Structures are given as structure tokens and as C-alpha cells.
Amino acid sequence: MLNYVLKRLLGLIPTLLIVAVLVFLFVHLLPGDPARLIAGPEADAQVIALVRQQLGLDQPLHVQFWRYITHVLQGDFGTSMVSRRPVSEEIASRFLPTLWLTITSMIWAVLFGMAIGIAAAVWRNRWPDRLGMTLAVTGISFPAFALGMLLMQIFSVDLGWLPTVGADSWQHYILPSLTLGAAVASVMARFTRSSFVDVLSEDYMRTARAKGVSETWVVLKHGLRNAMIPVVTMMGLQFGFLLGGSIVVEKVFNWPGLGRLLVDSVDMRDYPVIQAEVLLFSLEFILINLVVDVLYAAINPAIRYK
């Protein structure tokens, strides 16, 4: 297992290098000139040229890339073109709000989605199944921005129960986490149901019932562990999606997180921030998949990695 983990960690290097090259090319192909945006609409050509020189954008593309890579290898992600703060400080100040929002969204989405999926599988083709799958399809189909604005209108504007924007207290987390986790809960419900339906028809489940084991114990002890293996995979993918895909929700609720920072950086063509965030999201996905692989062996000891 240790050798497997070390090999996967070493595999991060070429993957992140490829991502760095692609994101560098992508941000420099974006339409618009960051120097013109920073200088302002009233700036003349001389001022814009001076800003480009200060930002290093007047140098050839390969020179800019080499400087970018060498700095990244030293842990230096550069300075924001807009705020003039180090990119690492910009990301650090926004990371925790996004992380806590992701965790709260993931907790309720996994618990609720798995409960719905297990109930739908146990009472297959009956009203719990139909109700649960109707809720799941609705959650997947409803756009996040529309759900967020609807919840905000009902619970913040009409009823006045919850705050609309900000991240100052636990109450601020309720509406964004519900919005962000709705699609994940729906996916988890459908995936858990599908996995449990397959497991419930296995021979060892019928054998356990024939021995007189209660249905609840059969489902929880024998069914849950075996059904969890594909579900854990989906949990890892969804966690990575939440951590890197909260852009729309953060924009709707004016959340001070990485998603909103990325949107603002793209609007202002803030190259260093865009590049650092995409690299961070890529690293998160890779590490989450590695954790999922390690969890396989914990859930089912029969699985071993060489």
C-alpha cells in the first residue's frame, strides 16, 4: 500500500506540469488585455505600455512561461495583477470559507442522499422508491443559480429567517450549503439505490436472511459495506466537484471563497491568480482520488494495491 501511495504521489509531478502548461496557454489566449483593464479606460497607449512592462507582459511568451514555472517550483505563485498582493495570500484568505462550505454541503448531501437511496432500494418499486427518485431527478434538473435565488427569495426576503450574503456566522452557511449540496444529494441517492439494488440480490444476502438474521441487520452489516465501494468513488468525485465547482453558488450568495475569486480574476484577466487556482483545483482532485483508493482497502480488506 505504501509503495502504491508513493507511486501515485510521484505521478503528481508530470500531471501538474501538463496542467500548468495548458492553463498558461489558456489564460494567455483569453480575449482582452489585462494591462488595459488595470490601467483603466482613460489610459493612453503610453500608460498601457508601461503597465505591460511592469507586469512582464511585454516579454516573449516562452520567457513568461519559463519565469512562471521556475517561480512555481520555488513555491512562488507570483503577485496578483489587480490587488498587488501575493497570490498565495489571496488564495489563503479565500480557502477556508470554500472548504467549510464544501464540507457542510458534503455532509448533509451524503447522509441525506444515502438514506434516500437505501430506502428506495429496500422498498423498490413502492412509494418510498418513487418519492425518493422523484426528489433526486428534481435536484439534478434544477439549476444551482435558480435554486439559490429561490431559497434566498423565500427564506431571506419573504420570511426573513436567514441572511442573504456573507460568511460571518453559521446561519450564512445554510442557504449556500443547501444550494451547493442539492445536486450531490440527488446523485448520491440514485447511485446508492443502484448499488444497493445489485447487492440485495446477491447470494450472501439471501443466505443471511435464511439464517434468520433480521432485515435491518442484513442491510446494514452485509449490504452496506459491499454497496459502499462504488458509492465511495462517487463521494470522492462529488467532493472534488464541490470544492472546485462552487463558482456559481459563491457568486449568487456573494461568498468570499475561491470560486468568486476565480470569476473576478477571469473578468480582470488576473493571470497569476487564475493559474494558481486551476493548479490548486487539479491537485485537490488528484489527492481526493488517492484518498478514495486508500479507503477502498479500509472498507473491503479483500482489496489490496501493489
Curated annotation (Swiss-Prot):
Assigned GO CC terms: plasma membrane
Domain ABC transmembrane type-1, residue spans: 95-292
Location of this chain's protein in the cell: Cell inner membrane
CDD domains, alphabetized: TM_PBP2
Cytoplasm recorded as keyword: no
Keyword Cell membrane: yes
Membrane-crossing segments per the record: 9-29, 103-123, 135-155, 169-189, 229-249, 279-299
Periplasmic side: 30-102, 156-168, 250-278
Single biological process term from Gene Ontology: transmembrane transport
Membrane topology value: Multi-pass membrane protein
Record topology, Cytoplasmic segments: 1-8, 124-134, 190-228, 300-306
Major place of residence: membrane
Keyword annotations of the record: Cell inner membrane, Cell membrane, Membrane, Transmembrane, Transmembrane helix, Transport
The protein's assembly and partners: The complex is composed of two ATP-binding proteins (GsiA), two transmembrane proteins (GsiC and GsiD) and a solute-binding protein (GsiB).
Family note: Belongs to the binding-protein-dependent transport system permease family.
Job of this protein: Part of the ABC transporter complex GsiABCD involved in glutathione import. Probably responsible for the translocation of the substrate across the membrane.
The protein's name: Glutathione transport system permease protein GsiC
UniProt organism field: Salmonella paratyphi A (strain ATCC 9150 / SARB42)
Lineage of producing organism: Bacteria, Pseudomonadati, Pseudomonadota, Gammaproteobacteria, Enterobacterales
Underlying gene: gsiC
